[in-house]
Curated annotation (Swiss-Prot):
It comes from Buchnera aphidicola subsp. Acyrthosiphon pisum (strain 5A). The keyword Transcription regulation does not apply. The lineage of its organism: Bacteria, Pseudomonadati, Pseudomonadota, Gammaproteobacteria, Enterobacterales. Keywords: Aminoacyl-tRNA synthetase, ATP-binding, Cytoplasm, Ligase, Metal-binding, Nucleotide-binding, Protein biosynthesis, RNA-binding, tRNA-binding, Zinc. PANTHER family: THREONINE--TRNA LIGASE, CHLOROPLASTIC_MITOCHONDRIAL 2, THREONINE-TRNA LIGASE. The gene is thrS. Homodimer. One of its GO terms (cellular component) is cytosol. Gene3D superfamilies: 3.10.20.30, 3.30.54.20, Anticodon-binding domain, Bira Bifunctional Protein, Domain 2, Threonyl-trna Synthetase, Chain A, domain 2. It is found in: Cytoplasm. Belongs to the class-II aminoacyl-tRNA synthetase family. Residues 243-534 are annotated as: Catalytic. This is Threonine--tRNA ligase. Residues 1-61 form the TGS domain.
Amino acid sequence: MPVIRFYDGSQQVYEHSVSLIEIIKNKKPSIMKSLIAISVNNHFSNLNTFIREDAFIEFVDQKNYKALNIIRYSCAQLLSYAIKNIWPLAQIATSNIIEDGFYCDIDFKRSISEKDLILLENQMKTLVKREYNILNKLISYSEAREIFQKCFEKYKVSLIDENINCNSKVSLYYHENYADIDIGLQVFNIKFCKYFKLQKIGGVYWKKNKNNKMLQRIYGTAWTNKQELDKHLDYLNELEKRDHRKIGKFLQLYHMQEESPGMIFWHNKGWIIFNELQNFVRVKLKEYKYEEVKTPLLIDKLIWKQSGHWDNYKNAIFTTLSEHREYCIKPMNCPGHVQIFNSRLKSYRDLPIRMAEFGSCHRNEPSGSLHGLMRVRNFTQDDAHIFCTREQVRSEINDCIKMIYDLYSTFHFKKILVKLSTRPEKRIGTDSLWNESEKDLSDMLIENHLSFEYQSGEGAFYGPKIEFILQDSLDRNWQCGTIQLDFYLPLRLSSFYINEKNEKKVPVIIHRAILGSIERFIGILIEECSGNLPTWLSPVQVVIISITDISSGYVKELFKKFSDVNIRIECDLRNEKIGFKIREHTLRRIPYILICGEKESSSKKISVRNRQGHNFGMIDVDFFIKKLQKEIITRNFYQMEE
């Protein structure tokens, strides 16, 4: 007498073994048309399966929150099936789901092109039209191995050998005659996989090991209905329009090249943005009483061993040799700041010491992960390290929080999310020290009226951490700011101060970052603003365009007037139609376009319009300059409207 329990908490008793079809007809016959999968005791089951013992059953229809991943798992292996149909000699390595989609890694003799994606997508659509049932089978280790050996699928054989015990069963899914290793619950019938799109091709090392073969990864997205798919594709189109790499190239801000992967060649206009942002942070550093320092790019490997960074991050650290001595190209600033702290004896009266640096850091990121300004190998950290006593921690944390929010408020992000990462299993320090430290951070967040989410066990082994995540207008989250307590590094690098009892005491270090990486933050801003940066950050703030040659003298006069008050200005005296000039400079995202013709020259005024197309009409030059200066000095995020 099997007792069947359902996801909604109800249960039903049967006097004999019963098929899943019969259970559905008794429980919820209306679900049959939209039923994509059934889970029995958290495992996929076929409709014809008979239940002979007590079981927990969940019906998954298209409205169920689990449906999306089930469809994506199915699409991932549908793609694998399509690949084998078109290119029988291609070897499937792995397939899986990711956020918003799925992927398949393949080993193939030639590079896959955009045209190939269309070919594969059409093949997938053809297979979906067959409306075949997807079958799940449990077979022995040796049977599974034999199936993939016969197909010359060496990657599948490798996965079975490494991940499955030889005495265990192997779960396979069958798309018609194509067999693949179970990666996740799939739909009953392929007809539920209509709404997908293949998107792009990338490269990835087998098992993420750069010593292994480079595979080709095909990415796709899949949804439960056409509306959701179209909505997602529209979102991706918007992302593409805002892509900082395209905008950066069009506006001539920077470029990158193969001879220096992950390194940025800043052009003049991009470097203006960089310096303006850096100078803004400098103003805040002065306001919050930080001292700015500069530490060497090369530091002996011995320091990095002492700090513990070599043991934990050596694969990401670039090194170089000179006179039989090995140096590390610094991946972070903290050990260098500790050297400055250690360079002379400190008293408790000297603390807190707030040390900031715009440090040029290098990290050996995998080439496949590099992405414009967002993921680079050389970046500028705006971090700081506060050396303080245990008693000063709370007030310093409080000031860090205020500084972070003060700076972020300038950029008007949609939302700031806050997360508090607490002690991991492997850690240093006593439980009482961790209790105090975590309470210090949480109390300061509460005192500042900030709601936050706990990330249990996600802190570093040397201390808890607060993360500040910026949410942009497209609902993407960017983790930028951090406040991290560290009891470990000063101990490792023998830092101490003399307390009021004339005893040596180890200081606490607070690691603090606001922008994180200046390069990455510029990329975030470009995408958030679609390249329409606020006037104070814009490389060119004003362009003056002439209507006729007659007004060129007045244009030059205006150019000098604006330049003399440090407004970044350009002239356009070309013999082109005025509409063409306006359109071109609007596309260049220049905040204000000044138009000068005979009327403006004779009245000594200017006609002003902004890049949104708002026309201010003809106004007094000095009045406009004052308004513009105010907008720049106050770092207003929005342009003047009147």
